[in-house]
UniProtKB/Swiss-Prot annotation:
Pfam family, one: Tyr_Deacylase
PANTHER family, sorted: D-AMINOACYL-TRNA DEACYLASE 1, D-TYROSYL-TRNA TYR DEACYLASE
Protein name according to UniProt: D-aminoacyl-tRNA deacylase
Domain remarks in the Swiss-Prot or TrEMBL record: A Gly-cisPro motif from one monomer fits into the active site of the other monomer to allow specific chiral rejection of L-amino acids.
GO biological process terms held by the UniProt record: D-amino acid catabolic process
Entries under SUPFAM superfamilies matching the protein: DTD-like
Organism: Edwardsiella ictaluri (strain 93-146)
Cellular compartment(s): Cytoplasm
Predominant location: cytoplasm
Entry keyword set: Cytoplasm, Hydrolase, RNA-binding, tRNA-binding
HAMAP family recorded: Deacylase_Dtd
NCBIfam families for the chain: D-aminoacyl-tRNA deacylase (TIGR00256)
Biological role: An aminoacyl-tRNA editing enzyme that deacylates mischarged D-aminoacyl-tRNAs. Also deacylates mischarged glycyl-tRNA(Ala), protecting cells against glycine mischarging by AlaRS. Acts via tRNA-based rather than protein-based catalysis; rejects L-amino acids rather than detecting D-amino acids in the active site. By recycling D-aminoacyl-tRNA to D-amino acids and free tRNA molecules, this enzyme counteracts the toxicity associated with the formation of D-aminoacyl-tRNA entities in vivo and helps enforce protein L-homochirality.
Catalytic reactions of this protein: glycyl-tRNA(Ala) + H2O = tRNA(Ala) + glycine + H(+); a D-aminoacyl-tRNA + H2O = a tRNA + a D-alpha-amino acid + H(+)
Amino acid sequence: MIALIQRVTHASVMVDNQLIGEIGAGLLVLLGVERGDDEQKAKRLCDKVLGYRVFSDEEGKMNLNVRQSGGSVLVVSQFTLAADTQKGMRPGFSRGAAPDEAERLYTHFSDACRASGITTATGCFAADMQVSLLNDGPVTFWLQV
C-alpha cells in the first residue's frame, strides 16, 4: 500500500463539477492499493501517515505531525501509484488490487483516519476527479508498507 503525502495549505476534490471533499492546512494523501494489501497494512500506513512529522515546530524544524499541527487530511484514491514503470513507455497496472478490494481498503484507511480523531475528507473512489491543492514547501513524501 502506497501513500503519496503532500503538505498543503488547502486542497479540494471535485467530481462532475461538484465539490466533494475539501480541507484547509494538512495533508493530501494520494492512496494506491496493491495486490496483497490488507486491513493490517491499511492501519499501519494510516498510523505512519498521521504520525509522520512533516510540519514545522517553533524553530522551523519538521517535528510535528498532522494532529500536532491542527491539520486535516484529504484522502484520494489513485491506482496509478501501483503502476509498474520499469519497462517500456506505457505503465502496467497488474500490481494494483482488484477494484472491489481496493475500494474496501481505501474505505478502511479513510475510516481509520477518522477514528483517530483527525478531520478527514475523501474523494470518490474510481471517479474521474479534479484535485486542487496548494503544496506547502513543497513537502512531498512517498510512504509504503
